[in-house]
Amino acid sequence: MSIEIRKLSIEDLETLIEVARESWKWTYAGIYSEEYIESWIREKYSKEKLLNEIVRSQSNLDILFLGAFADSTLIGFIELKIIANKAELLRLYLKPEYTHKKIGKTLLLEAEKIMKKKGILECRLYVHRQNSVGFSFYYKNGFKVEDTDGSDFIMEKKYES
């Protein structure tokens, strides 16, 4: 299986929402109710919201939105918001059957290459305390817990200039 990483396009919108739904249900089962997950998906992954973020990413503005594709099918994505020399990792999700296959790491490394070219010195993210898979992934990839915010760990990774 070959994996292609590229910026998401408008044509990826429907599949992006489905990947998000599958991933959220798998990641947060036992943490949040199914009703809460569906409500979150409707609010945070609405077509209008994602379309705006895809367009901003294509225009190289303040959003970097990359997809991982297996045989031309979207299987995961990463989204970062960039402000000056800092980035916030907003989302990194994979279809459940593609976890633990180094695809998340490939997405993160590709995003980090782009961040370095943009002069990003630090990346921050929030991960739910009970999301042990996510926490372990970020920790193994160089992120350290810097603080907490409610039910989330705030993790950061510093980069050389």
UniProtKB/Swiss-Prot annotation:
For this protein, the record's Gene3D superfamilies field holds:
3.40.630.30
Q: Name one GO biological process term.
A: negative regulation of sporulation
* Alphabetized CDD domains for the sequence: NAT_SF
Q: Which residues form the signal peptide?
A: none
Q: Which residues form the N-acetyltransferase domain?
A: 3-160
Q: How does it assemble?
A: Monomer or homodimer.
Protein name in UniProt: Spermidine N(1)-acetyltransferase
Q: Which organism is it from?
A: Thermoplasma acidophilum (strain ATCC 25905 / DSM 1728 / JCM 9062 / NBRC 15155 / AMRC-C165)
